[in-house]
Amino acid sequence: MKKKFLLILFCVLSPLLLIASSIDSISTTYKDGQFTTYSQVFVNASDSTCSLVIKDYDYQMRYNLDALFPWALKGMNLRKEKKELMMFYFKSTSFNKESNVLRGIGDVIIPGVITFPNIYVDCKLTSKPTINGNSTVYLNLLSSNGFIKNMNNSFSVIPSANKKGNWFILVTNVRFGWFFNIFITEKRFKSIMEWRLKQFIHNLKNEAEHRTVSSHQTSVNNFHSPKN
């Protein structure tokens, strides 16, 4: 009972502890085959801008994967742009509106060793409103043909304490299938997965801040434009 209480307390307090920190951070822990990664970045953008960025990502992940590569998936090497210890080719996604199930399909390549073609991952994609008026997006694994054994992720937008920006909070929990569980050690996880999670959350931050600057510049230009 005591252990269960401590676990619940940890889950409740973890996001608050992340928010309390004044710097961007990412860290991964490993226990019993599961990698848990906590990521946070401060975003100098309004609630509405941050929420719109997340909504755009959510929509494009469901219906227009290719549109994500110039911004949300930029620099993540998900289409074999450069050679690595483990490479990915993220081919496509399809979304079932009735069941809220998102299927992603791609290849996993270990250069010179083996290629696993057309690995699929079926996930339940949901979004729930939070008390601050934003929403948390959840991505939970339903089934996969080998690469991932278990996965649940959450992405939240949390207002900063001074109300002058927001925090993007990404929490990922993943267990790999038997072969990948052997291959992806704690050390390799950082070079295969953790840096991609960091790149992803910074991509969303950069997009939100870029939209903020562009919106401000447009307002300034409109203010100074000649009035007829």
Feature locations, PLM:
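Sec-dependent N-terminal signal peptides
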Residues: 4-18
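Hydrophobic ligand-binding cavity/cleft-lining segments
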Residues: 20-101
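Amphipathic hydrophobic-ligand
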Residues: 33-34, 82-84, 115-122, 147-154, ...
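Extracytoplasmic/secreted proteins, especially bacterial periplasmic and envelope-associated proteins
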Residues: 49-52, 188, 192-195, 199, ...
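Sec-exported extracytoplasmic/periplasmic mature domains
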Residues: 55-65, 198-209
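Surface-exposed patches in mature extracellular/periplasmic domains of secreted proteins
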Residues: 66-67, 212-216
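Glycine-rich portal/gate segments that line the openings of hydrophobic small-molecule binding cavities
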Residues: 73-145, 174-177, 199, 203-211, ...
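Beta-strand/loop substructures that line and gate deep hydrophobic ligand-binding cavities in soluble
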Residues: 127-194
